[in-house]
């Protein structure tokens, strides 16, 4: 039986080449593995256009581990962090800061609205104690893309430090760190780079990292110590996810061969366009306005019909070979379909056909061209 296609924002469908890269065992202290780590880190900084101003600090675990590591390492204990909040992953940052004992100020927005840089600027005027902003670039709850360049410009203008969760955008959307003033950008192996889950990373401004010694309350999640040890020895402080890194190396090779960010982004845009147009043809409507929709995951309004049941719908789509995101994060009844991974528009068309059949199996009519 073939593997299902994952229509989620990560983990996602990977290529056979990427999966094959995990067939080899690596010694974590061996020179060959050290070179593998170094090459991965160099490529990640290059993708972010970080130049010599930024370094990559890899971290074991999911992307959230690296988000917590960055916040705990780069924000001093007396820092005050503004968190523009338009979804679940912004809320997670607030929860992390609470656990770290760092003062946080939430700046709420609707889950269907992008963060407004002017509102951030107004928050600076109201709360001059703010030292940092922690911003999710692409809020995956509904698929909203926040205006990172404009937010970074506001932070630069007011001398505030910016930490960016780019979990679901890095590699697919254009990001240039050099000259941005961003202190750190965090992402992970199992997202738009199309690797497998298990490794996060922070691309950190050298000056910010150098100034962070002793900040982290954690041993394992201390980015400063992690990078210092890596710089000194070429090795990870603690056992690395060797197979995950080998898979990421293979995924990066494919990413570069495809044409890097412009080509990866174009494929995802094509997937997203195909998905939205095909779903509209069936009578489904999108939750977000097109102006804030990112080409990574699309939220659709669920059928307004008494026979609709998400679990039965999800199971029927799964039985047809496609895995949707299980459950809703928005306040309204919705479901989400991802556009990323080692898939193309033909896979999307087949997925939409499966969605149509699943809805009809519930006794709900859909439009047919």
Swiss-Prot record:
Alphabetical UniProt keywords: Aminotransferase, Pyridoxal phosphate, Pyruvate, Transferase
GO MF annotations, alphabetized: 2-aminoethylphosphonate-pyruvate transaminase activity
UniProt-listed GO biological process terms: organic phosphonate catabolic process
Catalytic function, reaction form: (2-aminoethyl)phosphonate + pyruvate = phosphonoacetaldehyde + L-alanine
One Pfam family, short name: Aminotran_5
EC number annotated for this UniProt entry: 2.6.1.37
UniProt xrefs under Gene3D superfamilies: Aspartate Aminotransferase, domain 1, Type I PLP-dependent aspartate aminotransferase-like (Major domain)
Modified residues (N6-(pyridoxal phosphate)lysine): 191
Enzyme class, UniProt record, top EC level: transferase
Listed InterPro entries: Aminotrans_V_dom, NH2EtPonate_pyrv_transaminase, PyrdxlP-dep_Trfase, PyrdxlP-dep_Trfase_major, PyrdxlP-dep_Trfase_small, SP_NH2Trfase/AEP_transaminase
Cofactor field: pyridoxal 5'-phosphate
Family: Belongs to the class-V pyridoxal-phosphate-dependent aminotransferase family. PhnW subfamily.
Job of this protein: Involved in phosphonate degradation.
PANTHER family in alphabetical order: 2-AMINOETHYLPHOSPHONATE--PYRUVATE TRANSAMINASE
Oligomer status and interactors: Homodimer.
Protein name from the UniProt record: 2-aminoethylphosphonate--pyruvate transaminase 1
Lineage: Bacteria, Pseudomonadati, Pseudomonadota, Betaproteobacteria, Burkholderiales
Gene name in the database record: phnW1
């Amino acid at each position: 039986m073939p593997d299902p296609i994952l229509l989620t924002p990560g983990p996602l469908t990977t290529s056979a080449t990427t999966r094959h890269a995990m067939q080899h065992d690596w010694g974590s202290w061996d020179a060959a593995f050290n070179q593998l780590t170094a090459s991965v880190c160099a490529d990640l900084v290059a993708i972010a256009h970080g130049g010599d101003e930024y370094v990559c600090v890899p971290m074991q675990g999911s992307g959230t581990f690296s988000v917590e590591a960055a916040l705990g390492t780069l924000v001093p204990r007396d820092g005050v962090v503004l968190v523009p909040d338009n979804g679940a992953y912004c809320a997670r940052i607030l929860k992390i800061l609470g656990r770290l004992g760092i003062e946080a100020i939430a700046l709420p927005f609707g889950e269907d609205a992008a963060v407004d840089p002017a509102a951030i600027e107004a928050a600076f005027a109201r709360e001059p104690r703010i030292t940092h902003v922690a911003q999710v670039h692409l809020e995956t709850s509904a698929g909203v893309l926040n205006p990172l360049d404009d937010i970074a410009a506001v932070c630069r203008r007011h001398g505030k430090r910016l930490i960016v969760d780019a979990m679901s955008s890095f590699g697919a959307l254009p990001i240039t760190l050099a000259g941005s003033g961003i202190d750190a950008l965090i992402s992970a192996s199992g997202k738009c780079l199309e690797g497998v889950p298990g490794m996060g990373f922070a691309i950190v401004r050298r000056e910010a990292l150098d100034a962070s010694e002793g900040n982290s309350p954690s041993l394992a999640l201390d980015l400063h110590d992690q990078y210092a040890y890596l710089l000194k020895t070429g090795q990870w402080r603690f056992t690395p996810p060797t197979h995950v890194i080998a898979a990421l190396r293979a995924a990066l090779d494919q990413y570069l061969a495809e044409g890097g960010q412009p080509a990866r982004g174009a494929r995802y845009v094509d997937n997203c366009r195909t998905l939205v147009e095909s779903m509209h043809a069936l009578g489904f409507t999108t939750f977000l306005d097109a102006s804030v929709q990112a080409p990574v995951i699309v939220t659709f309004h669920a059928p307004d019909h008494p026979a609709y049941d998400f679990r039965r719908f999800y199971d029927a789509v799964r039985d047809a070979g496609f895995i949707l995101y299980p459950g809703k994060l928005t306040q309204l009844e919705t479901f989400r379909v991802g556009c990323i991974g080692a898939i193309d528009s033909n896979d999307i068309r087949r997925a939409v056909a499966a969605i149509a059949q699943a809805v009809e199996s519930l006794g709900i009519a859909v439009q047919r061209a």
